[in-house]
């Protein structure tokens, strides 16, 4: 397979042969941390790999960093990988791309119960799991240190647990939700 590699001010764009359905004139620029591949036009047959240079030495900051697409002035998360000097992503449309950081914790909010409340008469427990930027990739839940099955409703960003499984005990119960 033939691959075209473009270098613009330390950024790298890798395009496989036959990525585009039609011939395309690309005006590529990389200035002030923004990779501009031009206006969105036709869809791609396959994705393009972009690599944006970084000088992030702090491991937490690097873990929180990702390639984002600028859409109407807002940054949209793109699943990204990190290497020593680049953050890279596969993209499926032209546009503007930057390195961004997701430093806000996801929101985990009980819906039908409160902390320190009696849940004995409940059939299910519902919680909202929400992350506005990078999303929640996976989660696990524990009652009193024991793994508990929570089902996920993606349309409402809710997880729920059927209490008929007998995992809760009389008195105080501890619920822990771990997420990535």
Model-based region annotation:
Residues 49-54, 85-93, 159-166:
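Exposed aromatic-hydrophobic patches
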Residues 22-71, 121:
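Proteolytic processing hotspots in large secreted/extracellular or virion-associated proteins
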Residues 72-81, 145-151:
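Surface-exposed loop/edge segments in extracytoplasmic proteins
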Residues 2, 86-105:
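C-terminal beta-strand-rich structural cap/linker in extracellular carbohydrate-active enzymes
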Residues 92-96, 122, 170-174:
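Extracellular Ig-like/FN3 beta-sandwich strand-entry sites
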Residues 16, 49-55, 124-132:
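Short edge beta-strand/loop segments characteristic of extracellular beta-sandwich folds
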Residues 98-118:
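Short, compositionally biased P/S/T/A/G/V-rich stretches that sit at domain boundaries
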Residues 1, 86, 132-180:
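Long, low-complexity serine/threonine/glycine- and acidic-rich segments characteristic of extracellular
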């Amino acid at each position: 397979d033939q691959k075209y590699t473009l270098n613009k001010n330390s950024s790298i764009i890798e395009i496989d042969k036959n990525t585009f359905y039609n011939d395309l004139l690309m005006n590529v620029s990389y200035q002030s941390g923004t990779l501009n591949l031009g206006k969105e036009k036709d869809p791609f047959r396959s994705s393009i790999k972009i690599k944006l240079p970084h000088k992030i030495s702090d491991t937490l900051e690097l873990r929180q960093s990702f390639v984002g697409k600028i859409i109407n002035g807002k940054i949209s998360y793109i699943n990204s990988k990190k290497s020593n000097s680049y953050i890279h992503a596969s993209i499926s449309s032209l546009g503007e791309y930057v390195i961004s950081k997701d430093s806000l914790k996801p929101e985990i909010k009980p819906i039908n119960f409160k902390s320190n409340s009696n849940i004995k008469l409940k059939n299910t427990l519902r919680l909202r799991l929400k992350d506005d930027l990078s999303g929640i990739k996976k989660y696990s839940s524990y009652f009193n240190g024991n793994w508990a099955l929570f089902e996920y409703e993606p349309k409402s960003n809710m997880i729920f647990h059927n209490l008929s499984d007998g995992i809760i005990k009389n008195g105080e119960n501890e619920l822990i939700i771990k997420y990535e």
